[in-house]
């Protein structure tokens, strides 16, 4: 099995081997690999072929091999993939093993729902705190996470070296809160505010989540299939 560090590609200015550019499409598939491989481990599986994995992923076996070859391959001819090994390597690629931490800003319905989920811990992200401006919730604990006043956000993030900021605030407040987090050293922002957030500081990665867009895509698919059925009839 090839090491994750032994990736063929170009060399940087210091003579070190550089990882080739990876497409967004491949990056978006990595969490799916991680999820499905985790399920296979839970089922007691030890290895899997690219053909079988392609059926689970609903992509071609060739695409599976191309995706994984971007990071070194990880497979053996005639054996396929060691599931635990591949799961571990993809966990490394996704940062699951980095010990990232997060704060949630906004203790409304969405913020509370995110606080309740086990999603963070299962992906190696520790939720340290929540923040809000409502005096009725400041000082409380929501699913075991203490709520602080947003005025404490900057100092808390700096002191605890917070990696990820989760925004569940009204769109009018999103930019200012994001700037506070960026100045405090937060490396990434998961934005659920109803706006497209862009920061001048390109060292901060922003992932804009629009739940409404996903709902409208579903509505479109339902409508389109309904129209196709009418035509067939």
Language-model segments: residues:
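N-terminal Rossmann-fold NAD(P) dinucleotide-binding loop
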Residues: 111
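Extreme N-terminal segment that seeds HTH/winged-HTH DNA-binding domains in transcriptional regulators
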Residues: 1-46
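Phosphate-bearing ligand-interacting subdomains
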Residues: 38-41, 145-233
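NAD(P)-binding Rossmann-fold cofactor-contacting core
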Residues: 122-143
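HTH-adjacent hinge/linker in prokaryotic transcriptional regulators
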Residues: 47, 51, 56-99
């Amino acid at each position: 099995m090839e090491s994750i560090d032994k990736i063929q590609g170009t060399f940087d200015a210091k003579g070190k081997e550089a990882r080739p550019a990876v497409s967004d499409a491949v990056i978006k598939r990595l969490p799916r690999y991680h999820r499905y491989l985790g399920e296979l481990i839970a089922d007691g599986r030890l290895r899997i072929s690219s053909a079988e994995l392609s059926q689970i992923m609903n992509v071609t076996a060739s695409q599976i091999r191309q995706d994984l070859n971007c990071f070194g391959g990880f497979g053996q001819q005639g054996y396929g993939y060691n599931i635990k090994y591949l799961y571990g390597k993809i966990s490394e690629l996704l940062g699951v093993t980095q010990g990232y931490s997060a704060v949630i800003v906004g203790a409304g319905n969405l913020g509370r729902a995110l606080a309740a989920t086990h999603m963070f811990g299962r992906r190696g992200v520790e939720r340290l705190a929540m923040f809000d401006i409502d005096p009725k919730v400041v000082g409380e604990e929501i699913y075991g996470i203490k709520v602080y006043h947003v005025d404490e956000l900057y100092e808390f993030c700096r002191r605890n070296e917070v990696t990820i900021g989760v925004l569940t605030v009204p769109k009018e407040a999103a930019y200012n809160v994001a700037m506070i987090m960026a100045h405090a050293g937060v490396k990434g922002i998961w934005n659920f505010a109803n706006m497209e957030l862009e920061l001048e500081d390109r060292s901060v990665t922003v992932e804009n989540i629009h739940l409404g867009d996903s709902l409208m895509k579903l509505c479109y698919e339902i409508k389109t299939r309904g129209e196709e059925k009418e035509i067939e009839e």
